[in-house]
Amino acid sequence: MLHREDDEGLIVVSQPAHAWVAGQMARQWGNAEFGEFAPHEEVCLAAEQHDIGWLQWEQAPTLNVKTGRPHTFMELAVPTHTAMWSSAEPLSLQYGRYPALLVSMHGTGLYEKYHDSSKDSSDDLEAIDDFLTAAHAFQEGLLCDLREDPLFSRHATLETITRNQRLVAVWDWLSLILCMGLKEKRKIDDVPVAKGKGKTLQLTPVNGDGNEVRISPWPFKRVTLTLRCEGRRLPGKWKDCLKMREALQSAPWVPIQIELRA
């Protein structure tokens, strides 16, 4: 779950809804400067389903007693977080091997590249190690299988897999920034391009509500792009998790529309 603030207060957006936005961008991604990617449908599906492991938790989110609000994805305990990423593997595998591989690699990439373990407990470190060990074995099995498949072998090279993994990470980060409401300039480095080293995307909000954003250089096929998802208006704060969940179940839906342009 992520939080989006506007003039009326808090909007909560589920991780699967945010992932859908990542998938919307994936399907419109690519031009002369940023190139294409393959296998197109499988990579788009991985982007769209990369947070499939959150589905169960989002139905009964936990309460952050310090804030009085539902936990965001950044506030959950490590064992809870790694368990969700572990559950994503068998769920995403129902869609196929290639999307499952990218979903799993996205999860391990988050811990290997971005997680700060300096304050983790011994239990946290053990949970991370167990998760990474099992996930790498899962990935290796899929890679061996895909490399023996005539349809997928050319898409299972280290170069192609690495590029596709990075694209999913870029779309994830873009979607998080946009769904949380962009208030100030941001950038995303090392974005894969058609040729040469990756480029840096500059994101600039046009207004104060984060509903219109300029991106440079422009990475999409269309000259403009409209993204959509839904959140729920959740006013107030709670001390009781069950009451928070009851309020969330009856909270009004809020359509979110974000316009991207060069």
Language-model-derived ranges and their functions:
Residues 11-41:
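Alpha-helical phosphate/pyrophosphate-handling elements in metalloenzyme active cores
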Residues 20, 29, 54-57, 85, ...:
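A residue-identity detector for tryptophan
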Residues 7, 28, 32, 37, ...:
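Sparse, context-dependent recognition of short Cys/His-centered cofactor- or disulfide-binding micro-motifs
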